[in-house]
Amino acid sequence: IKKIWYGDVITSAVTKTSLKTWLGTATEVENSHQNTWLYTEDDPTYTDYINELNGDIYYRDVTQKGAKTITFTMGVFSFDDKVDLQGGEKVDTDAGWAASDTPGIVNKAIVGQTKTGNYIVFTNAAVIAKGNAVEKNIGLGVTAVAMENPSAGVKSDYMFDGEKVDAA
């Protein structure tokens, strides 16, 4: 991974120009701990229909899309990052962090730029962040799952050619 950003949920269809603008307003993750970045797309759930006469599959019905997930651990982070991604609140301005009284999911847009330059965009990700032991430290582990976007015409996720976004 080259770069990671997070910010407010994206509420309009993403184009190369709007993505470049959004990146300028988003928070850039300054540190992703070694070997913690991962993008996965689960296989969809499906039902196979079998022809009794010969035992072959004659139709496959996709019943549920597979989840798309980005995970990484911030090895260095601020209390602002922790509040933004995990919830809770800062204590004594910037002296510490206090957990939320109720568990919950934080919704954010998450964008990753791959080493080849392409952008993976989750417009409305359900983010769960937690303390994550890495080496001799506690990092901020982030799991973001692409969710349906509540805004009409906005897809849950996009992928863009990095050169075209950067040139916009």
Where are these regions (language model features)?
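Acidic-leaning, charged glycine-interspersed low-complexity segments
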Residues: 96-131
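Beta-strand secondary-structure signal
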Residues: 69-73, 109-111, 141-145
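Low-complexity, polar-biased intrinsically disordered regions enriched in Pro/Ser/Thr/Gly
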Residues: 15-23, 91-100
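Mixed-charge, glycine-accented linear interaction segment located at domain edges/termini
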Residues: 117-168
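Intrinsic-disorder/low-complexity loop/linker signature
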Residues: 24, 88, 116-117, 162
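Solvent-exposed edge beta-strands and adjacent loop segments
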Residues: 1-82, 123-137
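Acidic surface patches and DE-rich sequence motifs
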Residues: 51-52, 114, 149
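Charged, amphipathic alpha-helical segments
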Residues: 75-99
